[in-house]
Each structure stands twice: as structure tokens, then as C-alpha cells.
Amino acid sequence: MFRSFAVLVAVSLVLSGTKNASGFAYIFAGETNGLDVVSHPQGYVGTGGTLVVTLGINPSTTNASQMVVSAQNVVRTINSKAVTTGNLEFVSLSGQVDFESTLLHEVGHSLGLAHVNAATESALPSSQRNYTKATNGANNSFDLNAGADGIIGSADDIRGDDDNLNWFKTADNNPFTLASVVDSTTYSRDLADLPSGDLFSTNGDRTVANQLFSLANTEAVMQQGQFFNELQRTLTADDVAGIRYAESGLDEIAGTADDYVLELRYAGITTNADIVINDSTGGFAFSRNSGQFISGGPGHIRMINQGVFFDPGANWHFNQQSNAVPEPSAALLLLAGSSILAVRRRRTG
């Protein structure tokens, strides 16, 4: 038996002159469904193996043909689970917004990842949305103090009775590096597991990266918000950890029978896909998802009924350059084979 709930989540990106911004967080985690909820991609039922999730583009979408390359690129980026730093690139797009960067963020939501910052859903003023994602606690009011360093989202933030929703690496609370094993033995949501002296889960936004970790132009993809003339097309350790932690399955231990490997596939211009890209009838860009508790896995939810939506009237930049690694040509393979043969001849001659 599966328990369903009709929670409908609409997650929007906000554009402004300032950036609205850690460890990773999951959609549906909170006071209603449980603080420790882990969300999994559609189709996961608690058994191991390859978990295929498809991404398609609604044929009626205004810019469908222009979205194809970016959709394929996002599939490869997520499947690679490659950790990068310096993933923010500033370019001249004549005031356009990079569609591929936005799509990568929204597909992350459809796979179960939440914003890692307080974001617009907190209803906080924009200047406070970079605080790490949390509930507002028993007093029903966010407790926000940037601590001695004055940097919002850092390890010395004082958050009162706010309940942390952001999973962190227990060894060092560093959201910009990845543990060799990603599961409940290396990551936690419980503040009692923080390194000695740390008060809260560290936020992975660009200011924290630059000022506290000496990492320029680096920010988690799952932070809310995007600048004009900015590319963010690769994942950070934050983002990869969120995907891999979920892959450790219902027991949250890597290397056991319930582990899965996410494989995102591009389905084409079709609505016959698990995640479908659509035109938005209101809002710049957002994902809409519901979820279902998984039998035998308390606190584990799988995504269902997913869609990502984009304003067709927005000033989008549609990337037409593939990120696929080119296959070596037959001539190059022949040349490589000849070189190996020549080396072998010299060694035996």
C-alpha cells in the first residue's frame, strides 16, 4: 500500500538585481511530512538497480525545438554527477536569461531536491533569503542572526528554535566538497552531528563560497534565483550529494540492496515522459510536483505527476551547443592504433 498526499508544490525562480540564495534539502521535508523526509525520483519503490526517469518537451510548447539541446545537456549533466567549482560563468547575453541553467535547477526539483536556502517560500524579505533552509520552529517565527562573521548562511549563524532542513557533511560542514561515501554515515540533518564549534548547516551560495572557502564564482545549482547574463550549467558537491544520498535507498546506507542509480533519459518532443517541459500560464519558471510515501520506508517519498514550466514570453537564451563528449573519428582511432603498433615495434626491435 502507498500513502498519497495531494501536496502541490510550485517552486518559482525570482529575478532581481540581487541574488536570492549548502548542504542539500528535499522537497516535502518539513513540519507537516517530517523533518527527515528524503525524496526520490519517480518510479523508486525501495528496490535497487537502475532507475530510469525520462524528460520530454511538450510538443505544444512555444519554444520546443529551441529547448532540445539544453534538455539533452541537462540529462548528461545530471547523469555525470560530476562535482565542479567555478560553475558560475558571466557572459554577455544582451539581458537574456539562460534557459539551460534554469532548466537544470527545475529538473533538480522534479527529482526531489528542494531549495537549499530559505528562498521565496519562506516569505522572508529578499535580504534574508540566503539563510539556510529551515522551518520556523515552535515559535512560528524565523530566528535569524548571522553570527560573529556577519555572513548569512555560514556555520556560526544563530537560528534559535528553527529546525534545520539542510543536510551537511558531518566531517567538516563544507558544502563544496563531496564525501567518498554519501549516506547517513557521512551526512546528517541533525545539528547535534555538526563539527565542534559549528552552530548551523553551512550554506552553499556564492558569497559563502568566496569569503569563507576562497572559491570564486561557485554556487549550488539548487539555490533559488538567477542573474541575467549568467550561466550555471554544472553541478556542485551540494547538488551531487543530494542525488547520491537519495540513491542510498530506504536504509540510507550506501552499498546495500535497496540502492539505485538514477539514469535520466531524454524522451524527445513528447508528453510521454516522467518529467515534461511546458509553457507557463503564470510565473517565470517553476516545477510542479506531488509525492507519494513509499511502503516500508518511513520518511521516504517518491515524486509523481511532475512538470516544469517556463514563461514563453520571457527573454530566454537557448543554448545550441551540445556538452556531449565527441566520439573519436575512425581516422583518429586508426592513427592511435598505428602509434601503439609503432611503440610496440620499437620495444621489441
Which sequence ranges carry the predicted segments?
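Bacterial N-terminal signal peptides that target proteins for export
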Residues: 1-7, 329
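Short, charged juxtamembrane terminal tails flanking transmembrane helices
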Residues: 346-349
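General helical secondary-structure elements
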Residues: 15, 171, 340-343
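Bacterial N-terminal signal peptides
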Residues: 7-16
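Zinc-dependent metalloendopeptidases
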Residues: 17-324
